């Protein structure tokens, strides 16, 4: 049985700041060697050349080592950064750590009640020619199943959030594929971000039984195929799929629980509230921010501009805008909607949601404190 989880959200005060992680460790909230995953937002451009993700990654790993975690162990900790804090979104990190068994007393002791659990896995290496094709779907699906097993989850219905980081295509990797006589799905590096995310989401959906195995032709074209729990990011930092499965399991113990839902479109506040309720908070029929009473740890969303250029029947110009890419516009929009619900702009809102939730909407996961 996996260990119980402690999870906290902390602000990031500057690009290279990890002082709040250090404070959590110094205050005894968690131990450096027990940190198992970090998921956060950095303030870069969110694109191919967003190096704030690399800077933040280094800062957080250095703190873990400074506070006593073995360097080799720290190298293996999955740290997923989503670049781009457009609009009111505030840079932050959500940190997951295991709890020593001796600390699980009273209401926190393991029981039949489902509580938060986390599992991690890495896929086989993803070659540039795999990205956007069924080879990638298969490799991701295999890694998701391993992460589920490590989280102690046997029923896919108990998986509420799968956060991934996968490689996108760069000029260098495209050149590499061609030198070996291979082709790539696209030679547009920015488009490959959407491609990598979408293909990864299909792998998650296959692993969890949400869809049957799609064909190469379905990738990015059949938007009726999607996962309701996938949250996929991509970058230049790695050549494998990094998979973090977050769900609930009995017998784990602890004080936290996770739930999920989907936003049907960019304005669907109800979808966010449904995820919070699904996590276990008892809320009124028409809840307000004040009803959360400090019990919401964080929400995690993916968003996407609807392919028809409409929101609730009204036309918008995001997909035609040559000045500001639609990635930044929809992220800013949904970030504002989300912060209005939670009352906190430190929310994980990430763009590029192909095959992640319905077209124009996206998955929502919420972690709450039931302690």
UniProtKB/Swiss-Prot annotation:
Q: Does Protease count among this protein's keywords? A: no
Residues at the active site: 165, 233 (nucleophile)
Region (RU B) location: 115-250
Residue ranges, annotated region (RU A): 1-103
Superkingdom in the source lineage: Bacteria
Q: In which pathway does it act?
A: Pyrimidine metabolism; uracil degradation via oxidative pathway; malonate and urea from uracil: step 2/3
Which Gene Ontology molecular-function terms are recorded? barbiturase activity; metal ion binding
Q: Could you tell me the Gene Ontology terms of the biological process aspect for this record?
A: uracil catabolic process
Means of activity regulation: Inhibited by cyanuric acid.
Q: Which family does it belong to?
A: Belongs to the cyclic amide hydrolase (CyAH) family.
| Assembly mode | Homotetramer.
Q: What does this protein do?
A: Responsible for the hydrolysis of barbituric acid (2,4,6-trihydroxy-1,3-pyrimidine), an intermediate in the oxidative catabolism of pyrimidines. Catalyzes the hydrolytic opening of the pyrimidine ring of barbituric acid to yield ureidomalonic acid.
The identity of this protein, by name, is Barbiturase 1
